[in-house]
From Swiss-Prot:
UniProt family annotation: Belongs to the universal ribosomal protein uL1 family.
Annotated InterPro entries: Ribosom_uL1_bac-type (IPR005878), Ribosomal_uL1 (IPR002143), Ribosomal_uL1-like (IPR023674), Ribosomal_uL1/biogenesis (IPR028364), Ribosomal_uL1_3-a/b-sand (IPR016095), Ribosomal_uL1_CS (IPR023673)
Protein name as catalogued: Large ribosomal subunit protein uL1
Superkingdom in the source lineage: Bacteria
Function: Binds directly to 23S rRNA. The L1 stalk is quite mobile in the ribosome, and is involved in E site tRNA release. Protein L1 is also a translational repressor protein, it controls the translation of the L11 operon by binding to its mRNA.
Keywords: Repressor, Ribonucleoprotein, Ribosomal protein, RNA-binding, rRNA-binding, Translation regulation, tRNA-binding
A GO biological-process term: regulation of translation
MF (Gene Ontology): rRNA binding; structural constituent of ribosome; tRNA binding
Gene3D superfamilies listed in its UniProt record: 3.30.190.20, 3.40.50.790
Cellular component terms (Gene Ontology): large ribosomal subunit
Length: 233
């Protein structure tokens, strides 16, 4: 059993672990349990009913949070010529081609949150799969990060589009804001996330798709959400 900090144990006393909370109450409570000295991220954890043994049921895509995550997103773009210029003008932090591939390979450069590529770049960045893949940074058509529309993609990821995927236990973890967000913004982000995840239900999933949803802060305990009321929002 991992040892929890005194702060965590105090926060856990505020949460009734047998209760499923309505969203408004859960948001109030998650803020009370976020007692660290930094502005903690509020996270939504969704347990899905997918069978992870079946690759066709794996979920990978992007969702848009109306109020963003509260984190400054660093975007890297693999592009050349006019597309490279468009990416820079749209606000990309790093733009390049072979030079960036080399920087990642030889220097271990990973100071970015999202990597976008034009389709013609895939042949030169394919060898980065072993580095970027495990970190969830490899450009992919499924996540909208392999595209000719680089300027639009850069702007969307800067504004609040985030990539989501199921982990090896079929769970999805989504940052939905910061403790400093007002309650209404957190609520709107959470509802938007749930609705968009519902639309990603793979065709082969039988039974209930979203089995459980839990809200927590970076350092705080989990707060179980009342799914019936949440799905009606």
């Amino acid at each position: 059993m991992p040892k929890h900090s005194k702060r965590y144990l105090e926060a856990r006393k505020l949460v009734d672990r047998t209760k499923y909370y309505d969203l408004d109450e859960a948001i109030e409570l998650v803020k009370k349990t976020a007692t660290a000295k930094f502005d903690e991220t509020i996270e939504l954890h969704i347990q899905t009913g997918i069978d992870y043994r079946k690759p066709e049921q794996h979920i990978r895509g992007t969702i848009v949070l109306p109020h963003g995550t509260g984190k400054e997103v660093k975007v890297l773009v693999f592009a050349k010529g006019e597309k490279a210029k468009e990416a820079l003008e749209a606000g990309a932090d790093y733009v390049g081609a072979e030079d960036l591939v080399e920087k990642i390979e030889k220097e271990g450069f990973l100071d970015f949150d999202v990597a976008i590529a034009t389709p013609d770049m895939m042949r030169i960045i394919g060898r980065l799969g072993k580095i970027l893949g495990p970190r969830g940074l490899m450009p992919s058509p499924k996540s909208g990060t392999v595209t000719q529309e680089v300027a639009e993609a850069v702007k969307e990821f800067k504004k609040g589009r985030i990539e989501v995927r199921t982990d090896k236990t079929g769970n999805i973890h989504i940052p939905v804001g910061k403790r400093s967000f007002d309650n209404e913004k957190l609520k709107e982000n959470i509802i938007a996330a749930i609705k968009q995840i519902m639309q990603m239900k793979p065709a082969g999933v039988k039974g209930q798709f979203i089995k459980k949803a839990v809200l927590s802060s970076t350092m705080g305990p989990g707060i179980k959400l009342n799914l019936q009321s949440l799905l009606k929002e």
